[in-house]
Amino acid sequence: MRLLALSAVMLMSGSVAAEEAPLRFSIADAWAMPLVQIDDHQPTSGIIFDIMQSMAAQANLSAEYRVVPIQRVQRTLERGAIDVRCYAAQSWMPNLSGDYTWSLPLLIQRDLLISTPDNATPRAPASLTNETIGTVLGYVYPTLQNAFDNRQLRRDDARSEVQVLQKLQIHRYRYAIGNQWSLDWFNRNLPDDQKLRGVAVIDEQPVGCIVRNDTDIPAQRLMRILLRMRMSGEIDRIMSRYNTVSGLPADRPAAP
């Protein structure tokens, strides 16, 4: 009888432990503010951090963050070492293998061709030839991939979004690619005559979260939480903390 009681206690303890397993999120080490601030290899603030924190809290789960190089994020997801990747687009992971659920789009990322104040004339990306373009190591730029493959343009990879803009600022190259949020954050304390300028829109990409389908992960509950965050205006309120906007209308999310 005592053995049966002990077995029951152990089973209950195992069930509680399973329910309390943390929700494991990936953080790309190349990200920068306002997306995320990383201190001592852990995120501490930023748009994506706030979204993930709220997502886990509403699911009554603790959040665990794995900071990894962007090139390894997909592999980490496929291996089951993380449960959720936020700030993701299907076009960035065309060869993803496994069973996953995608959220509705939460934000619209606008990628810009960026230059310095002395070279701020609007420029069609297709007109660029024999240019070195500042890029982030491991980032995919679908609209410019043919130009890179054909060597019409050359990548100059830096390890983070901030480093790309810093190298542009000191004229290591004439053009770089960055998103509107990172550009605005980088420029926020610069005098007007020193602010980097967007000279063309490269791409506009809906981004959301992807959750690994596993019996231990409440994927559908997480999808409902993200939908509620979007429709209630919580995503927009998070964006406003960082003086920016999601790019999606608050009352009518874009289709997945």
Question: Which sequence ranges carry the predicted segments?
Answer:
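Extracytoplasmic small-molecule ligand-binding "clamshell" domains
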Residues: 19-98, 135, 157-158, 222, ...
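Periplasmic-binding protein-like
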Residues: 29-31, 107-112, 188-227, 246-256
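Bilobed "Venus flytrap"/periplasmic-binding protein-like clamshell domains
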Residues: 30, 42-54, 116-150, 156, ...
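Extended ligand-binding regions for polar small-molecule ligands
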Residues: 46-58, 118-121, 126-127, 131-132, ...
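Ligand-binding clefts/hinges and TM-proximal coupling segments of bilobed small-molecule sensing domains
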Residues: 62, 140-155, 159, 227-256
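Short beta-strand-to-loop elements that line the ligand-binding cleft
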Residues: 62-69, 152-167, 199
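Acidic, polar ligand-binding/catalytic clefts
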Residues: 65-127, 137, 141, 198-201
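Short helices/loops that flank or line small-molecule/ion binding pockets
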Residues: 71-83, 127, 161-182, 189
